[in-house]
From Swiss-Prot:
Cellular compartments annotated: Cell membrane
Tissue-by-tissue expression: Highly expressed in the testis. Largely restricted to germ cells in the testis.
GO CC entries: membrane; plasma membrane
Record lineage: Eukaryota, Metazoa, Chordata, Craniata, Vertebrata
Subunit architecture: Interacts with CDK16; this interaction mutually increases the stability of CDK16 and CCNYL1 and increases the kinase activity of CDK16.
MF (Gene Ontology): protein kinase binding
Protein name: Cyclin-Y-like protein 1
Alphabetized Gene3D superfamilies for the sequence: Cyclin-like
Job of this protein: Key regulator of Wnt signaling implicated in various biological processes including male fertility, embryonic neurogenesis and cortex development. Activates the cyclin-dependent kinase CDK16, and promotes sperm maturation.
């Protein structure tokens, strides 16, 4: 995974990615009727606060001899953006969305306890000695529908539990609308519900034929943008921030990514020039750091599963069949053989004592 994403860095330095190929044109769903469905009836009002503009950071590529461009890994990060404290860069730092969701989770549990609310019929299936229940989502092949639900729920908690209303003009939908129809000012005073965020993201992923892995990388870029640019995602900017993160993630993850003009066919009223400008600003605010280590990706995947469990978004479980058990065993054996080959190669380079006995490992048996 890291190899593909590092290779994609070379494509992103100019703010626009050269295309390696182009897939068939996306479908054109009736999108406009869904995106701006009013949420005033059920949404919670939020007091508007003046937006504080944040100037994009100056980029210094350190031109040296022969106009050598400094690699992203060689540049020093600012002290306030230390990797150890940034969850989108460091695998040990806690994800922002999970910490923002804990307040609501604790309040919900406390309310259920005080009101003696019964959890009702258990829907989650547990394994026993005779039956093993597994879902169809793995870290390498997540379930698309469930992953989009989890990612949009994480975005929902980002908006609901934001610290302020700091934003940038390039992401402000009032300055750069996604539709020609005039959106009432009241629309921007209410937090969007989870179902509206899900509908917006699902429409883009369905029309552009994006994968579940792309959704996870989208969330990584979104949190990285909020941290680097020191802004908040709020009712006035969430659509353009999410759109920019999806646009960038699709180009990094997929060699035959959707073109900017294809997104214009999905959103219809947005121009290619606006998409290009937003992409350029997004990359500059990320300081062109589009690298997503495998450890960071895995952390976001498992934290999304924890978020789903806390909010009763259960994955679809099914009994382990004999055919799937054989497939899992074959995959495990292949990985084990590769690991043994690496160990042997390392031992050949490092052994200096005679009669060295390697570590014995027991074989796992699936029955």
């Amino acid at each position: 995974m890291e190899t593909r994403i590092r290779a994609a860095q070379l494509k992103g330095r100019g703010g626009a990615f050269p295309k390696l190929g182009r897939r068939a044109g996306p479908a054109e769903p009736d999108y406009e009727s869904e995106v701006y469905e009013a949420a005033a009836g059920d949404a919670v009002a939020v007091a508007p606060a003046p937006a504080a503009a944040v100037e994009p950071a100056e980029l210094d590529f350190g031109a040296g001899e022969g106009h050598h461009l400094q690699h992203i890994s060689d540049r020093e990060m600012p002290e306030d953006l230390a990797l150890e404290s940034n969850p989108s860069d460091h695998p040990r730092a806690s994800t922002i969305f999970l910490s923002k969701s804990q307040t609501d989770v604790r309040e919900k549990r406390k309310s259920n306890h005080l009101n003696h609310v019964s959890p009702g019929q258990l829907t989650k299936k547990y394994s026993s000695c005779s039956t093993i229940f597994l879902d169809d989502s793995t870290v390498s092949q997540p379930n698309l529908r469930t992953t989009i639900k989890c990612v949009t729920l994480a975005i929902y908690y980002h908006i609901k539990n934001r610290d302020a209303n700091r934003s940038l003009d390039i992401f402000d939908e009032r300055s750069h609308p996604l539709t020609r129809e005039k959106v009432p000012e009241e629309y921007f005073k209410h937090d969007p519900e989870h179902k509206f965020i899900y509908r917006f993201v699902r429409t883009l992923f369905s029309a552009a034929q994006l994968t579940a892995e792309c959704a996870i990388v989208t969330l990584v870029y979104l949190e990285r943008l909020l941290t680097y640019a020191e802004i908040d995602i709020c009712p006035t900017n969430w659509k353009r921030i999410v759109l920019g993160a999806i646009l960038l993630a699709s180009k990094v993850w997929d060699d035959q990514a959707v073109w900017n003009v294809d997104y214009c066919q999905i959103l219809k009223d947005i121009t290619v020039e606006d998409m290009n400008e937003m992409e350029r600003h997004f990359l500059e605010l990320l300081q062109f750091n589009i690298n997503v280590p495998a450890s960071v990706y895995a952390k976001y995947y498992f934290d999304l599963r924890s978020l789903a469990d806390d909010n009763n978004l259960n994955f679809l479980f099914a009994p382990l069949s004999k055919e799937r058990a054989q497939n899992l065993e074959a995959i495990s054996r292949l990985c084990e053989d590769k690991y043994k080959d690496l160990c042997r190669a390392a031992m050949r380079r490092s052994l200096s004592a005679d009669n060295f006995i390697g570590i014995q490992r027991s074989n796992a048996i699936l029955s």
